[in-house]
Design a protein with these regions (language model features):
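Alpha-helical membrane-targeting segments
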Residues: 2-44
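A generic structural micro-feature
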Residues: 39, 54-56, 92, 141
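Short helix-to-loop capping/linker segments positioned immediately adjacent to catalytic or ligand/cofactor-binding
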Residues: 34-35, 133-137
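Short, well-ordered beta-strand micro-motif
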Residues: 46, 148-150
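Short, structured beta-strand-loop surface elements
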Residues: 78-132, 139-143, 151
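Short beta-strand segments
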Residues: 42-77
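Basic, alpha-helical terminal appendages of large translation-related enzymes
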Residues: 1-2, 147
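Residues that flank catalytic or metal-binding motifs in active/ligand-binding sites
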Residues: 43, 60, 94-96, 145
Length: 152
């Protein structure tokens, strides 16, 4: 299913201040690269999107979960905050301008938002591989979007 903006929540975990996130992002990327693209026991990919409002390219490290068919699942969790992460809004605005870097290789990807049974299967995989994600629905009342990224 194409990407569509999911409703935001009315409650959630406290978000990181925007300025702190902007200042820390380049440092976090360097640290993650040195740790072989892993963080907290999870594999990462570097997601590049085009800003929904700014039009500027943005790259963020995101936990990735192999879909078993050569693609990856990513969860727009934002740690269980009431709002989706900025990268999700960027994808909604520009779904045809998304790329990833995995294991040093960059490629453009097609993005599908999962729903129904596909979403449930992916969510089960995510929680099995990264149990901390299972706590996020307790923090927020929004459904956490799960996106499948497939090499184009």
């Amino acid at each position: 299913m194409p990407v569509r903006k999911s409703p935001e929540g009315t409650r959630g975990a406290r978000p990181m201040p925007r300025l702190a996130g902007k200042l820390l992002q380049p440092l976090m990327i360097r640290i993650h690269r040195r740790s072989k693209d892993r963080f907290g026991g999870m594999n990462l990919l570097y997601l590049t999107t085009v800003g929904a409002r700014s039009g500027e390219r943005r790259t963020v490290p995101v936990a990735r979960f192999d879909d078993g068919a050569g693609g990856w699942y990513v969860v727009a969790s934002a740690g269980g905050t009431a709002r989706h992460p900025a990268w999700y809004y960027n994808i909604v605005a520009h779904p045809d301008q998304v790329s990833v870097e995995v294991a040093g290789t960059s490629r453009r990807v097609e993005v599908d938002q999962l729903e129904g049974e596909d979403r449930e299967r992916a969510w089960d995989l995510v929680v099995r591989e990264a149990p901390r994600f299972g706590t996020y629905p307790e923090k927020t009342d929004r459904e956490l979007p799960i996106l499948r990224l497939t090499p184009a």
